[in-house]
Amino acid sequence: MNKRLSRGKISLLASVFVTTTFMGGVNVLASTAKTGIRDITSQQVVKEMKVGWNLGNTMDATGGETNWGNPLTTHAMIDKVKAAGFNTLRLPITWDGHIGAAPDYAIDATWMNRVEEIANYAFDNNMYVIINLHHEDGWLKPYYANEAEVKAKITKVWTQIANRFKDYGDYLIFETMNEPRPVGAADEWSGGSYENRDMVNRYNLTAVNTIRATGGNNALRHIMVPTLAAAALSTTMNDYIVPNNDSRVIVSLHMYSPYFFSADLTSQWTTATWGSDADKAALSADFDAVYNKFVKNGRAVVIGEMGTINKNNLDSRVKHAEYYAKEATVRGITPIWWDNGYCVAGKEQTFGIFNRKNLTWCCPEVMQAFIRGAGATQTQTSYSLGDVNKDGKVNAIDYAVLKSILLGTNTNVDLSVSDMNKDGKVNALDLAVLKKMLLS
């Protein structure tokens, strides 16, 4: 999705966690198994990806990581996502605003470092990571008149990204673009014109060729490549061209389906109810169209974005999440939930299911249904950071328990919930961080 949220209060806790210093060069923190390219197909990779979660409205936020109301990303956040059963992190990134002038289009080193730092949080959890070009609509225009300029910039930008990550293994997946489309046109979301679709194919080819040309592991890296607007429409799928018929290209689609249930709140057609036999048949038909076009013909597919907004309709959302994940998985397709961090019910764009400020699932039933439908499993019984007494809530009682630990009257210490600043110790600093969390 590409609508920004209104600015929210930034968590005071977040700044405590982000202290990693980069020493230059490629900083591969993942295990050895993640630093090689295996002899497996893209379909096998997608099967291993299982089910995913988007770190939305964060590194894709224009102006900076916290500009759209989410806190700084921490290792603990990604730990929590992995523990819930998600095996893939999609990391949407807006590079525009962090790119220098032509002809070099140099990417700001601090921004590149931060991207790598967050990616490594997921690699440390043995997760797949997807890195893309996200809100680049200001320059990535799908028109013949813009072709030369756009291709030059794509080449420079992807060369820098690909070189930075070329030593990472096949748990890292590149995605050429997010939702390339004719922004502002009447047919922006309904397939665009032939010119638009043709230009998206050309830009995808430029990106894939650029990535492959950097060599190293990028020569065989699996790359996600979208249709126009990443839409699963007959026009966009029929005019889609796989760059070079590359066997390691994965089709990237976004399916907020059915739209008026999943993503619409204000139109006359909006609905908060889903789950009838007719509803299920219609959603299955959407997946059949994707399967018959691509998967049946040996082409791997990832649904890079899906989700439902919170309309105070928990029962329908749970039914939809489980059925959606099941229908995708049985067809060999990985679904990835779009989480923009916005959990408040009854407002537009409330796709959030995870509260990153207190590390709790704001819609646990929806999350569990999604995981269940995909056949994934939780890796462990996990508790939120700060839930010192492990009762499933973070509140003043946890503050009292942590204080008793520091006073020596309680020796039952679990670093995973008590070490608030992740420095390997439990002391007064952690008590201060917990206090800030409770007050935020």
From Swiss-Prot:
Tell me where the signal peptide lies: 1-33
Q: Where is the active site?
A: E179, E305
Q: What does this protein do?
A: Has endoglucanase activity on carboxymethyl-cellulose (CMC), xylan and lichenan, but not Avicel.
Q: Name one GO biological process term.
A: cellulose catabolic process
Q: What is the top EC class of this enzyme, as a single word?
A: hydrolase
Which keywords does the record carry?
Carbohydrate metabolism, Cellulose degradation, Glycosidase, Hydrolase, Polysaccharide degradation, Signal
Please list the GO terms describing molecular function: beta-glucosidase activity; cellulase activity; endo-1,4-beta-xylanase activity
Cite any additional comment in the entry: Up to 32 AA of the N-terminus and 52 AA of the C-terminus are not required for catalytic activity.
Listed disulfide bonds for this chain?
none
Q: Where is the Dockerin domain?
A: 381-440
Q: Which Pfam families match?
A: Cellulase (PF00150), Dockerin_1 (PF00404)
**Family, per entry:** Belongs to the glycosyl hydrolase 5 (cellulase A) family.
Presence of keyword Cell cycle = no
Protein name per UniProt: Endoglucanase B
Catalytic activity, per the record? Endohydrolysis of (1->4)-beta-D-glucosidic linkages in cellulose, lichenin and cereal beta-D-glucans; Endohydrolysis of (1->4)-beta-D-xylosidic linkages in xylans
Q: What is its EC number?
A: 3.2.1.4, 3.2.1.8
GO CC field = cell surface; extracellular region
Keyword flag Signal = yes
